[in-house]
Swiss-Prot record:
UniProt: ATP binding residues: 17-24
Annotated family: Belongs to the IPP transferase family.
Cofactor needs: Mg(2+)
UniProt EC number: 2.5.1.75
Protein name, entry field: tRNA dimethylallyltransferase
Molecular function via GO: ATP binding; tRNA dimethylallyltransferase activity
Organism whose genome encodes this protein: Gluconobacter oxydans (strain 621H)
Length: 332
């Protein structure tokens, strides 16, 4: 790897892609190369209660280069796009002040797009609306609540999967608490994009290799104490609708701890659910560019630290970024 490269132009890197594609490893290597600060852009890795199941970077990696917005929220606090955007912008400013490159790393596309394209702010619908939405989701189920939402806010409901409890509950609370649907709010003028240049790298590995990696990693999570992590979370008696309680692996392992299913069955269910989620992630990223013009590249391989193939892949990515950073410096 080449000597660290100091970046003085207001540029930020984005490392995006589906779960288990190697984003954290790539971001770490890029941070070493470009004197970067890695900023979490994963909606589940913000929770301090879920270090293992969300595959947060290891302590040694976090010590090697600055890592920000990892494990900063309690599981009882629901994160939001608006909250993350504000925190990410603050961390980006800190990185630039320290003459470091902000490297936004994660698979939550809506978080990243809130920086690259801006964000419409939705007013807080209030505790009463939230309680009503969660109560209905538990009482009648997500599909019935989705049907109700379709009657009052078809524009929003038509874009949601009928079994997506979290998003349906959110849409219902916004409609009841503000008098307008999410789709309406998103059509209004909002916050502008971040005032910097983004250079993005999207990892899009082939499906079969990704599936094997997901299965292997979930096994490693179990060995590392994922069951104990979920047990500690359940002991807190938190609302099951909270995002942290719905993180991949939490519902499945909770069922094991309640004696409802054997561990192997739960493992298979979790791996399948994660696989389906990565397909949705990959589809989303294919339809939403995170860099303008030629400031984005797609790598069709999973990234690891050690493989010779990844070393060649890394050199291509580093050269791609260096060319665009140098061009920005010349233009400034």
């Amino acid at each position: 790897m080449n000597a660290p490269k100091t970046v003085t132009v207001k540029t930020a890197l984005i490392v995006a892609g589906p779960t288990c594609s190697g984003k954290s490893a790539l971001a770490l290597d890029l941070a070493r190369c470009f004197e970067g600060t890695v900023i979490n852009a994963d909606s589940m890795q913000v929770y301090r209660d879920l270090h293992i199941l969300t595959a947060r970077p290891h302590a040694a990696d976090e010590a090697a280069v600055p890592h920000r917005l990892y494990g900063v929220l309690d599981a009882a606090v629901p994160g939001s796009v608006a909250w993350w955007r504000s925190e990410a912008l603050r961390e980006m400013d800190v990185a630039w002040a320290e003459e470091r490159m902000p490297i936004l790393c994660g698979g939550t596309g809506m978080y990243l797009r809130a920086l690259t394209d801006g964000l419409v702010e939705v007013p807080d619908p209030g505790d009463a609306a939230r309680s009503e939405a969660r109560g209905l989701a538990e009482e009648i189920g997500p599909e019935a609540l989705h049907a109700r939402l379709m009657q009052v806010d078809p524009e929003t409901a038509s874009g949601l999967r009928p079994n997506d409890t979290q998003r349906i509950s959110r849409a219902w609370e916004v409609w009841t608490g503000t008098g307008h649907g999410l789709a309406w709010w998103r059509s209004q003028p909002g916050l502008p994009p971040a005032s910097c240049r983004f250079v993005s790298v999207q990892l899009d590995p082939e499906r079969e290799g990704l599936r094997r990696a997901i299965d292997s990693r979930f096994g490693q999570m179990l060995e590392a104490g994922a069951l104990e992590e979920v047990s500690a979370l359940l002991e807190r008696g938190l609302d099951p609708v909270l995002p942290a309680m719905r993180a991949h692996g939490v519902p499945e392992l909770a069922a094991v701890l309640r004696g409802e299913v054997p561990l192997e069955e739960a493992r298979k269910s979790a791996v399948l659910a994660i696989g389906r989620y990565t397909r949705r992630q990959a589809t989303w990223f294919r339809h939403h560019a995170l860099g303008k013009g030629d400031d984005g590249m797609i790598s069709l391989r999973r990234y690891t630290h050690s493989a010779q193939e990844s070393e060649s892949q890394y050199e291509k990515i580093e050269n791609f970024i260096s060319e665009r950073v140098d061009a920005a410096a010349r233009a400034s």
